[in-house]
């Protein structure tokens, strides 16, 4: 899909056409292609062509031209609005909450599900006060227990004693979200250890499609559908071939504004469950979305996977045939487990750890998905709520107090370009934020930030990618000015905003950055 915007740029093609090693026929072909793009743009009296979500390269492009053209791949409106959320919350709640397990086997009795003081408004208000903008509810986990009274199975809240079988967790949570103006998403596990049809691919795909249809039809707007890749072959020995194309069609038809995450083609998994993004995080990547034979073949050819360190470098782009706007989501739990376990009440992540996670997710061009599991009462535990409160207060106190006078003025930067900013007099800083206008692509490959100290420029920090947002911390410093230099960029970079802040010191985190978490394979994320 081609999107026309207001700034003219045909440099990559001009360079291409002037190269001496191309045949006349190839130049004619490319000239024709570019003329076609310009005609498309002229329909709206605009001259620059961007590629929304996906670009397949013509075979005749050189490596350098591929890299330059990657700078013109942009997000869809849904992807852009999703990225702006920054903070989202996972709610793992279900039969596992009452059995003490992480993965149920589907044999659990629905009578076990009986929260004693269910309060969805408490969930949403606690998360909203901490700055979260969307929640994703586990409507069904791998055990197959459904949190809504589905027509597809009796393994649901309708068979539980909660509200005498008349309750609907999905509806209660969605209505609470609406009351608090919180966006709502669903997690629906394709792997179902209770469904009799699981392993009979056509039958189960119809079963799953019906469940998906119920959730996307009966509860109003849904903003994200989180599709897990676990399929249980190793656990149960049943081989189920999911009809992903069918599932995508249902989502796109019933909830066109929702992003499809993880096994979907709008949002990708960062590759670990530790709350740690990449130092170099490209939203433009040749990583093929989803799980299919063609996807596996191409990803293997490029030697990339969701867990790879490099998903978007020039070397990877040069080898690719198709590239995607496929941004990263960082998922991690506030506790060791994903579901509530009372023995973990004293293992809730510290404020220092939560702040680190924020800098290593939102601050590394990703969206954070922080899991906060309700307890057997049906409430967020007081320990979790207190840490959320402290986290929200800390982030607000830090980033609501801008120290730059003129950081919100957008600018365009070629490689080597700099801009200076004035710092409010007598203010100390130790944190910097940079943002690109990703509606015009992600382009910056390397930058440096300096402070004017003792009449000379001193390096404070440096980095590689920026993307939607990059946050960097450094030692406390008092400087009258800040200078940002874009050392390397794939094309003219569109710097949307630069900010400088002072973050209060926190007690050092004693555990290793990665804790005791385990990296998982991409097809067994949860």
Residue ranges and their predicted role:
Residues 476-478:
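Surface-exposed, short loops/turns at beta-strand junctions within beta-sandwich domains
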Residues 1-51:
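Bacterial Sec-dependent N-terminal signal peptides
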Residues 47-453, 458-474, 485-496, 501-504, ...:
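Mature catalytic domains of secreted/periplasmic carbohydrate-active enzymes
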Residues 509:
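C-terminal functional segments of enzyme domains
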Residues 481-483:
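Short, conserved beta-strand segments of beta-strand-rich sandwich/propeller modules, principally
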